[in-house]
Amino acid sequence: GFNLGNSVYVNGSSNNYVAWCFKAGGTKVANTQGLINTNVSANTTLGFSIVEYNGATNATNDQSNNSGNYWSVGHGLGATPDLVIVKKLNDVGSWYVGGAALSSSGTNGNHLVLNASSSMATQSNILWGGSQTFNNTTFGLGGWDVVNRNGDSYIAYCFTSKPGFSKVDSYAGNGTTSHLIQTGFEPAFLLIKGYTHGGGWVMLD
């Protein structure tokens, strides 16, 4: 289980709440596969990891790019992450979403924002970084302070699809009432976001 304080956002008197819980790998371990060292708790069987890291010491402004090499962060999944959600911990900032499912790369900077209803946006060469932005050991970062800045700390939640457990992908709507999206299993939790148009995130369970 987990313990709560008395914040009205999670534990207000007479209020009801829902929590979705994912088990990662237990005790976090050091990961040195990227240029930025991380602490990772990874469940490679279920395709989920939690990654803690500090911004690179030479990421001092949005245009920083490590002399064109950018930065990489080890995620511990052993497979390319389809979805990565990054949040700055020590200051205000939004939750930035990218990954293979959005065809995110350093060049296009494709991303969504978890706490916003906007469509997919781009931030070329400052959000994600490097030629192999998402691969089976690391994901790449630029110098934008929302994901990588000297003196700041971050957390990333990484997901890769696993048959029978999870599926992260995109699909095209057709406006009908009988549009079946194949996942290979019966989902218990569903998160949907229209990325070509504005609108909120839809969560079903």
Which residue stretches match the model-derived regions?
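Surface-exposed molecular-recognition determinants
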Residues: 1-205
